[in-house]
Amino acid sequence: MAYDLIIRGGTVVDGTGCEPYVADVAVTGDRVVAVGTDLGEAEKVYEASGCYLAPGFVDIHTHYDGQATWDQEMAPSSWHGVTTVVRGNCGVGFAPAAPDRHDWLIGLMEGVEDIPGSALSEGMSWNWESFPEYLDALEEMPRAVDVATHVPHGAVRAYVMGDRGAANEDPTESDIASCLLYTSPSPRDVVP
């Protein structure tokens, strides 16, 4: 079988915990299809002797929540071998988002992460309100990396509690019940 690409003689660190080993890696399309020795021919062959080959890295703590709406590459993470990013960390994010809370959510993100609010304001289209609508907006854009997300509790509190949530007031029992709806195992079922 002829592959699109073979990377020959690299030291493979496969993430399973086994010792690194020297092998060839064959790629067809955008998939690794074989790892071993003497894999045959390919349209392109790269010699990787002295180099390490590893699966893509998963960055479990990012704040790409806004950038994900305009940057297909998730730069600079994708430039450094990251193939999956997780967002919604530290309780900050941009959904659910009532229209009158956009600036507050941007300020919250700006305070947690050194991301200029002006970049977020100019970059985001805000073509969503609910968390499912946010996910739909993200799915419309092709990506260089996979994305996963937490439902950010700061956005949920502000959405459910309005000014009281933004002011960090204690939630009522009713507020907690409403917040739980937005953090259910299937937030796609909760649309305002």
Regions from the PLM with identified roles:
Residues 16, 36, 66-68, 86, ...:
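Activation segment
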Residues 2-8, 12-56:
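Histidine-rich, glycine-flanked metal-binding segment
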Residues 70-180:
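Divalent-metal coordination cores built from histidine and acidic residues
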Residues 17-18, 58, 69, 161:
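Short capping/connector residues at structural and topological boundaries
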Residues 54-74:
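Di-metal (Zn2+ and/or Mg2+/Mn2+) metal-binding site signature of metallo-dependent hydrolases
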Residues 45, 65, 96-97:
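Short Asp/Glu-rich motifs
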Residues 182-192:
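Single conserved hydrophobic/aromatic residue that forms the stacking wall/gate
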